[in-house]
């Protein structure tokens, strides 16, 4: 009985994680993405979403979204010749300046320095 209950809980957690990740994947590039939008899309309250995300993902919603944006930004910096403004827009930041500041916090270098390093093969 206990194992069955645990298995059902794990299925629900995995279902939540899948739906959450799918929604973020589809919408991370929107600079106006909000927790309320995600909660509505997943048919739960904002509070429930925060709790489930923390339990299931071991991180906050904002942190998860920013990590996704940074991962995609790194990919674009390595694989494209897009400008910083274009990359910022594609990964969900309203300005290149804000994107640059957040990128530097996450990586320790500016997006331009990151791109130059990658082009040199370092």
Language-model features, listed with the residues they occupy:
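Arginine residue identity/basic-tract feature
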Residues: 12, 46, 69, 97, ...
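Terminal helix-turn-helix DNA-binding modules in bacterial transcription factors
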Residues: 55-94, 116-122
């Amino acid at each position: 009985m206990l194992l069955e209950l645990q298995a059902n809980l794990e299925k629900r957690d995995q279902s939540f994680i899948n739906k959450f990740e799918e929604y973020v994947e589809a919408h991370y590039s929107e600079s106006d993405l909000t927790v309320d939008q995600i909660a509505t899309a997943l048919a739960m309250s904002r509070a429930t979403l925060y709790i489930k995300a923390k339990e299931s993902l071991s991180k906050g919603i904002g942190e998860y979204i920013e990590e996704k944006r940074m991962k995609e930004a790194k990919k674009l910096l390595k694989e494209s010749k897009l400008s910083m403004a274009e990359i910022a827009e594609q990964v969900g930041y309203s300005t290149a300046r804000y994107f640059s500041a957040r990128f530097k916090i996450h990586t320790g270098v500016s997006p331009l320095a990151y791109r130059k390093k990658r082009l040199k093969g370092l």
